[in-house]
């Protein structure tokens, strides 16, 4: 796969990036080098290789997933000037 100058112009227009003609030629060359590298990577046989999530083998500590109200109701409603039954009271805005 390769990129031509028209594709670079179209992508730069879509990305709202202004490019001069000499920059279009440079970007075309650079993008083709990058795509060549990606094609090289796709040719590597990785069958049987487990995905690597970390360089160091680690086990994450898990906590029990339980639903709570956080026991923060009093702290939250303390921020409101007027409350009733743990709800914020506000002035009527629309009639």
From Swiss-Prot:
Name of the gene this protein is made from: gatC
Q: Is the keyword Nucleotide-binding in the record? A: yes
Alphabetically ordered keywords of this record: ATP-binding, Ligase, Nucleotide-binding, Protein biosynthesis
Indicate whether 4Fe-4S appears among the record's keywords: no
SS bonds (residue pairs): none
Biological role: Allows the formation of correctly charged Asn-tRNA(Asn) or Gln-tRNA(Gln) through the transamidation of misacylated Asp-tRNA(Asn) or Glu-tRNA(Gln) in organisms which lack either or both of asparaginyl-tRNA or glutaminyl-tRNA synthetases. The reaction takes place in the presence of glutamine and ATP through an activated phospho-Asp-tRNA(Asn) or phospho-Glu-tRNA(Gln).
Record note on quaternary structure: Heterotrimer of A, B and C subunits.
Which Enzyme Commission number(s) are on file for it?
6.3.5.-
Q: What organism does the record attribute this protein to? A: Bartonella henselae (strain ATCC 49882 / DSM 28221 / CCUG 30454 / Houston 1)
Organism's domain of life? Bacteria
Q: What is the lineage of its organism?
A: Bacteria, Pseudomonadati, Pseudomonadota, Alphaproteobacteria, Hyphomicrobiales
Q: Which PANTHER family match?
A: GLUTAMYL-TRNA(GLN) AMIDOTRANSFERASE SUBUNIT C, MITOCHONDRIAL (PTHR15004:SF0)
- What InterPro entries does the annotation carry? Asp/Glu-ADT_sf_sub_c (IPR036113), GatC (IPR003837)
Q: Which family does it belong to?
A: Belongs to the GatC family.
Q: Which BP terms in the Gene Ontology apply to this protein? A: glutaminyl-tRNAGln biosynthesis via transamidation; regulation of translational fidelity; translation
Could you tell me what this protein is called? Aspartyl/glutamyl-tRNA(Asn/Gln) amidotransferase subunit C
């Amino acid at each position: 796969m390769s990129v031509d100058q028209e594709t670079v112009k179209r992508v730069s227009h879509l990305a709202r990036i202004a490019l001069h003609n000499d920059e279009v030629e440079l970007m075309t060359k650079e993008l083709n080098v990058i795509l060549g590298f990606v094609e090289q990577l796709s040719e590597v046989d990785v069958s049987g290789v487990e995905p690597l999530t970390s360089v160091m083998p680690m086990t994450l500590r898990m906590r029990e997933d339980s639903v709570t109200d956080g026991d923060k109701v009093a702290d939250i409603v303390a921020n409101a000037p007027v409350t009733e039954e743990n709800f914020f009271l506000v002035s009527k805005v629309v009639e």
